[in-house]
From Swiss-Prot:
Composed of two chains; the small (or glutamine) chain promotes the hydrolysis of glutamine to ammonia, which is used by the large (or ammonia) chain to synthesize carbamoyl phosphate. Tetramer of heterodimers (alpha,beta)4. The gene is carA. L-glutamine binds at residues 61, 255, 257, 284, 287, 325, 327-328. The lineage of its organism: Bacteria, Bacillati, Actinomycetota, Actinomycetes, Bifidobacteriales. This is Carbamoyl phosphate synthase small chain. It holds the Pfam family CPSase_sm_chain.
């Protein structure tokens, strides 16, 4: 069910056994409960990956977001203990068209439906997700709520809640723009990933301080595979504490929320740049580098979320298929080197190194005069293609060259 042609709210037919999705603009969809029963609200977004739903659910960048899967059939391979990218599910809610009734995979340890229920994730299924996603592409992402079970009942009267009552709950949800969320998802204590693979048991080639703003588990492992000892540190870390780690380079991770609200992290990053440490940032880290250099950031209409986004490396002309999860982007000029705006070009020249071929959104920044670069997407490939794995090699090369120069 949804708005009628006049734009007013249609009266949906639903009962206590249904699940109801209410959008901020009044659209209503009635389906079946999926996962836990209850109420959840957040920003509704869509993800275009055909696979990798466990990695999606456990990506901290999805904090306070209701995720719609555009691929209709979800849950075939069940869930396992190997694929999660963090210690918990972070999505606020989950929407699929046709959940798989059967689990068929040799690694499966349970069903997705049961896992969502066990973790208290309220979901919804059996709605026209294609129609919903087309609406979000047209109107933009917005606040929404999923209601099922007792959440559909007015406790005072015992009657089903009206759409107006449900819509009021949705409109009381904070807007994503203006939210600071990285502290909410960051580790509270430092932990270390030692070199692995061919470097296991050997002295590290490089030491990296990785600031956790919502880091995915695979990311430090990609650096460890290249001989790095990675200290994953809380977002509350000070520059002095970073210096005490004696790192060869500093990394800023992905994460949720509005980069404009990350003032302390931007100031920390400027201290890192001032000290001459090699810097690599991804996703939220790219946005923070942009703001540290003096560029602005802005909210995208519906963002990039999925594992099939085409990105062009403007330095080589090569096109990469990449994994994305971002609703904000850096506002920087494309096609030329410019002076970084902060403090009259204090950080020298910078240029946009990567763009998204779907919409020309900035997907990477490269500093010319200081050892710093970043990308807006996820090179760790969890889930997703491995086209951008070379970026971790580039970071290692940057640390190697910086060490040779005695910095």
């Amino acid at each position: 069910m949804s708005q009628n042609e006049s734009g007013t709210i249609a009266i949906p037919m639903y009962d206590k056994d249904d699940a109801v999705l209410v959008l901020e603009d009044g659209q209503v969809y009635v389906g079946k409960p999926y996962g836990a029963l209850g109420e959840t609200t957040g920003e509704i977004v869509f993800a275009t990956g055909m696979t990798g739903y466990q990695e999606t659910l456990t990506d901290p960048s999805y904090d306070r977001q209701i995720v719609v899967q555009t691929f209709p059939h979800i849950g075939d391979t069940g869930v396992n203990s190997e694929d999660p990218e963090s210690s918990r599910i972070w999505v606020a809610g989950y929407i699929v068209r046709d959940p798989s009734p059967n689990v068929s995979n040799w690694r499966a340890e349970g069903s997705l439906d049961d896992d969502l229920a066990k973790n208290g994730i309220v979901g919804l299924s059996h709605i026209d997700t294609r129609k919903l996603v087309r609406h979000l592409r047209s109107a933009g992402v917005m606040r929404a709520g999923i209601f099922s079970g007792d959440a559909l009942t007015d406790q005072a009267t015992g009657a089903l809640k009206t759409i107006e009552q449900l819509l009021e709950d949705v409109k009381n949800t904070p807007q994503m723009q203006g939210l600071s969320l990285y502290d909410e998802v960051s580790t509270k204590e430092t932990y270390t990933i030692e070199p692995c693979g061919e470097y296991e048991g050997k002295e590290p080639l490089y030491t990296v301080a990785a600031v956790d703003l919502g880091i995915k588990g695979m990311t430090p492992h990609r650096m460890a595979e290249r001989g790095c000892r990675v200290h994953v540190v809380p977002s509350t870390i000070t520059f002095a504490e970073i210096e005490n780690l004696n790192p060869d380079g500093v990394f800023f991770s992905n994460g949720p929320g509005d980069p404009e609200q990350a003032g302390p992290e931007i100031e920390l990053l400027r201290q890192v740049l001032d000290a001459g440490y090699p810097f690599f940032g991804i996703c939220f880290g790219n946005q923070l580098l942009g703001r540290a250099l003096g560029f602005g950031t802005y909210k995208l209409k519906f963002g990039h979320r999925g594992i099939n986004q085409p990105v062009k490396d403007l330095t080589t002309g090569k096109v990469e298929v990449t994994a994305h999860n971002h609703g904000f982007a850096v506002d920087a000029p494309i096609g030329k080197q410019v002076d970084a705006p902060f403090e009259n070009g204090k950080y020298g020249k910078v240029f946009v190194s990567h763009i998204d071929l779907n919409d020309d959104v900035v997907e990477g920044l490269q500093c010319v005069d200081i050892p710093a670069f970043s990308v807006q997407y996820h090179p760790e490939a969890a889930a997703g293609p491995h086209d951008a794995a070379y970026l971790f090699d580039r970071f290692c090369e940057l640390m190697k060259n910086n060490s040779k120069e005695g910095k």
